[in-house]
Every structure is written in C-alpha cells, then in structure tokens.
C-alpha cells in the first residue's frame, strides 16, 4: 500500500529534525514517484495538495509549484525506487505540522503529522 512508514511522530520544540526519506517502491518514478513535504503549522494538507495541482504542479517542479512553497518548511524532490534524500528542518514552536506527498493523487494515503510539544 502506498503510504509513509510513519504517519505520526512527536518531538520537543523548538528543534532541528532530520528526515531520512527513502522510496522503497519498485515502480518507475514517472508512474509512482514520492516526495515528503512538511507544511507549516496549521496548514490544511488536503487543501494544499489540491491547490498544488491547480497551481501548476509538474514533474519539472517536483510537483511543488514555486508559489506553493511558502506554505512548507521543507521538502524533498520526487524520488524514484531506491532513491533517498535527507532533510534537516527547523521546527520553530509547538504545534501540529502536517506532511504529504504531492505526486498527483498520492496525498489521500501519503500523509501524516509531526506533533511538536
């Protein structure tokens, strides 16, 4: 099933969080690429993901249009099978920070929350 290995994790804020993102899938990137986009506190993940599509999400912009990036704290590129990327993201304060995959259609299952206490 298409999903992140963890759909929730908790930290103490403020903090620098290291995210090691690895695509364990087998299908080609063009058909089943994945990314990790950590959104700012309070952002509606579903609305954000849908807005990415109407804002011009394409493979060239990693399915994260430039005008949508101000709503994110950090993101990876779209990864194909076996690819990995590490992010270090500042979590400034306590709150709930959603994360999603912005590859078209993936946000329904590939989502989660980072809870900062």
Positions of the model-derived regions?
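Residues that flank catalytic or metal-binding motifs in active/ligand-binding sites
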Residues: 15, 32-34, 83, 110
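Divalent metal-coordination and catalytic microenvironments
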Residues: 19, 36, 101
């Amino acid at each position: 099933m298409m999903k992140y290995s963890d759909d929730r994790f908790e930290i103490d804020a403020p903090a620098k969080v290291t995210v090691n993102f690895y695509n364990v899938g087998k299908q080609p990137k063009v058909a089943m690429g994945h990314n990790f986009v950590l959104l700012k506190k309070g952002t509606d993940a579903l609305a954000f993901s849908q807005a990415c599509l109407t804002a011009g999400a394409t493979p060239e912009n990693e399915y994260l249009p430039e005008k949508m990036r101000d709503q994110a704290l950090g993101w990876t590129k779209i990864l194909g099978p076996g690819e990995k990327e590490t992010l270090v993201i500042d979590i400034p304060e306590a709150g709930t920070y959603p994360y999603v995959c912005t590859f078209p259609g993936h946000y329904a299952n590939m989502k989660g929350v980072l809870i900062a206490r």
